[in-house]
A protein has these predicted regions:
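Short acidic, glycine/serine/threonine-rich helix-capping segments at coil-helix boundaries
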Residues: 151-161, 165-211
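Aromatic/hydrophobic beta-strand junction motif of beta-rich domains
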Residues: 65-75
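Enriched for extracellular/lumenal, surface-exposed ectodomains of secreted and cell-surface proteins
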Residues: 118-137, 289
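Exported/periplasmic cell-wall-interacting domains
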Residues: 81, 162, 169, 218-224, ...
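Short, compositionally biased P/S/T/A/G/V-rich stretches that sit at domain boundaries
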Residues: 34-62
């Protein structure tokens, strides 16, 4: 009979023979924290300012006239805005905030008009302040010198430069040197004739406003005549016209007085006489009988000749050089009418 073990020992042995309980599972490692999202750096841009409707370098304008500052911004970001400030004598006088319009190639632009009620320098500055989408950046400032519109013989400076530039743009014969000399005075008189203004060799606000609007251009009547001359007896001006009706040059002139009127009609230059003749006519271009386009010492603002078309002597040489034998000459009154009778004694 097998030997029985004591009870405590049996219990201990039974416990030893039982399978071991599994070890508790290890706790899972904590998940790694997500990396913080990176915010893209705000884009940096650039602004280029351009002043429009001003003349020369440095830009000049007339007080009361509107100038436009145009800003080109790159890169263009929808919804972004630019602050434009205007300074006079270092003091801020106006601030405007403007939006941008896309213009392609990743750029945008803005236009902002401004003017000055007094003479002096006005500076425009543009800044884009930082936003989440764009960093802060600015453009190079632009300065405009505003000048009085009242200039006359002997004046020099920005107002005269503006005057000469505007007259030249309308094809009046004028120097571009910033001096109100005799040639500038002649151009002003020619312009005033065409624009229907008082015939004085000076300027004012009205004249500059009309120039800015393009008033006072010469209206070509005979576009089909190609390269030709037109003499407007109503306004007392003469114009050289290129093919397709392009105005080349406009001059003041004086035609035949009422007792010896200039004949109207369509003619062609048939003879040219350089220099001065016995009657004091300079560089003459004859278009019918004794009627000629020529220089003369006296060219009043009204019809005063014996039938010829007088032009200032300083303009006679250039007209003589431009006109050829066979060049058409159209002489007319704007409202029609005029004398068709050829006077055999026509002269200066």
């Amino acid at each position: 009979m097998p030997r029985r073990l004591p009870l405590p020992f049996a219990i201990l042995l039974g416990s030893a023979l039982l399978p071991a309980a599994p070890a508790p599972a290890a706790a899972p490692a904590p998940a790694a924290a997500p990396a913080p999202a990176t915010t893209p750096a705000a884009a940096r841009g650039r602004i280029r300012l351009v002043v429009e409707h001003a003349v020369g370098s440095p830009p000049a304008a007339i007080i009361g006239m509107q100038i436009v500052v145009r800003g080109i911004v790159a890169p263009y970001v929808a919804g972004e805005r630019v602050k434009v400030s205007f300074y006079r004598d270092g003091r801020k006088v106006q601030v405007r905030t403007v939006g941008l319009t896309p213009i392609g190639k990743g750029a945008g632009q803005f236009h902002l008009g401004f003017s000055s009620a007094r003479a002096g320098l006005l500076q425009a500055r543009a800044v884009h302040y930082a936003t989440p989408a764009q960093a802060q950046f600015s453009g190079r400032s632009q300065t405009v010198r505003f000048a009085s519109p009242n200039v006359s013989s002997g004046a020099r400076g920005p107002a005269v430069r503006v005057l000469q530039s505007e007259l030249n743009a309308l094809h009046y014969v004028v120097p571009l040197d910033g001096l109100f000399d005799a040639a500038t005075a002649r151009a002003v008189i020619a312009y005033r004739k065409v624009a229907g203004l008082e015939l004085v060799p000076s300027t004012n606000t009205q004249l500059f406003r009309l120039l800015a609007r393009g008033v006072g251009s010469f209206r070509v009547r005979f576009r089909g005549d190609g390269r030709h001359v037109e003499a407007d007896l109503s306004r007392q001006v003469l114009a050289e016209i290129e093919p397709r009706g392009r105005v080349l040059a406009i001059f003041t002139m004086s035609s035949g007085k009422p007792s010896t009127p200039t004949v109207v009609g369509h003619f062609r230059v048939y003879s040219k006489t350089p220099g001065v003749n016995a009657e004091g006519m300079v560089d003459s271009n004859y278009f019918i009988a004794g009627y000629a386009i020529h220089g003369y010492p006296e060219v009043p603002n009204y019809a005063a000749s014996h039938g010829c078309l007088r032009v200032p002597i300083p303009n006679a040489a250039s007209i003589f050089s431009w006109v050829r034998i066979g060049t058409p000459v159209d002489v007319y009154h704007e409202t029609g009418g005029g004398s068709h009778r050829v006077n055999s004694h026509a002269g200066p």
